[in-house]
């Protein structure tokens, strides 16, 4: 049984940590790596319960962040996509001296809609959790389709995301269930003012999971951060617009 998270490292330059989202694994960054490794020493991980970290579990966002901090560079820019953005944000709060810059991609401090807060309807997350017990592979595929919905290149986006999922061991069903619970329950909004590192928030205007209007709400909660919205992207702008995505990242890390 594996007892340590699966990390991979490539490239040279300042350290950059990449954290994937729910249902995925570190292979999701594959097409981005040739654009990043000439400029950064890139570290990407299979999160607890995913890919080659299949046998490792973490029950809370704090535990996930700490597991990553335990084996990550002494200081680095952390980039987290979707659920990975929640983990990166938690790491930035736990260890600001280690997470020197924060980049959140198609992410939110509170994924579930609540009152006037925009997000995923709780019923949708409940349905996904119920479906997991029946056919978790189909549930992951439905989530992939949701992530690409709205993108002009949706079919190609889904193909690339699916290739990443299938290239490594399937996710642990328990980790998938825990991840959906975290997406439904975690709320970091009250702590965002404590983030003092440079922070870039990236969104897709066509995102059906994290509505682009959340960007404006976040301007109020985290005025110390900056943000960019990719006009023709959905939930995975680094898949649909890799060159534009990397250029935005390079401009921020300068």
Swiss-Prot record:
It comes from the Bacteria. Its main location: cytoplasm. Its EC number is 3.1.1.85. Keywords: Biotin biosynthesis, Cytoplasm, Hydrolase, Serine esterase. Signal peptide: none annotated. It is found in: Cytoplasm. GO terms for biological process: biotin biosynthetic process. The active site is at 82 (nucleophile), 207, 235. InterPro entries: AB_hydrolase_1 (IPR000073), AB_hydrolase_fold (IPR029058), BioH (IPR010076), Carboxylesterase_BioH (IPR050228). One of its GO terms (cellular component) is cytoplasm. The physiological role of BioH is to remove the methyl group introduced by BioC when the pimeloyl moiety is complete. It allows to synthesize pimeloyl-ACP via the fatty acid synthetic pathway through the hydrolysis of the ester bonds of pimeloyl-ACP esters. Belongs to the AB hydrolase superfamily. Carboxylesterase BioH family. This is Pimeloyl-[acyl-carrier protein] methyl ester esterase. It comes from Photobacterium profundum (strain SS9). The lineage of its organism: Bacteria, Pseudomonadati, Pseudomonadota, Gammaproteobacteria, Vibrionales.
């Amino acid at each position: 049984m594996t007892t340590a998270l699966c990390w991979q490292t490539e490239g040279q330059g300042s350290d950059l940590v990449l954290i994937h989202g729910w249902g995925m694994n570190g292979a999701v960054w594959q097409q981005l790596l040739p654009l990043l490794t000439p400029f950064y020493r890139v570290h990407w991980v299979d999160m607890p319960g995913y890919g080659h970290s299949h046998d490792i579990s973490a029950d809370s966002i704090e535990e996930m962040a700490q597991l990553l901090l335990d084996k990550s560079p002494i200081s680095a820019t952390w980039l987290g996509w979707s659920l990975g953005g929640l983990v990166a944000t938690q790491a930035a709060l736990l260890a600001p001296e280690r997470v020197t810059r924060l980049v959140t991609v198609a992410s939110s401090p509170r994924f579930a809609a609540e009152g006037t807060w925009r997000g995923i309807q709780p019923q949708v997350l409940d349905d996904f959790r119920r479906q997991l017990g029946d056919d978790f592979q189909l549930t992951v595929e439905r989530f992939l389709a949701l992530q690409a919905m709205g993108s002009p290149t949706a079919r190609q986006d889904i193909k690339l995301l699916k290739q990443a999922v299938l290239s490594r061991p399937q996710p642990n069903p328990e980790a998938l269930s825990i991840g959906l619970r975290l997406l439904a329950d975690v709320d970091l909004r009250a702590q965002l003012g404590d983030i003092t590192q440079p922070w870039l928030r990236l969104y897709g205007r066509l995102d059906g999971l994290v509505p682009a209007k959340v960007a404006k709400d976040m301007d109020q909660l985290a005025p110390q951060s900056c943000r960019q919205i990719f006009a023709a992207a959905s939930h995975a702008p680094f898949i649909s617009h890799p060159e534009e995505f990397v250029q935005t990242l390079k401009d921020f890390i300068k």
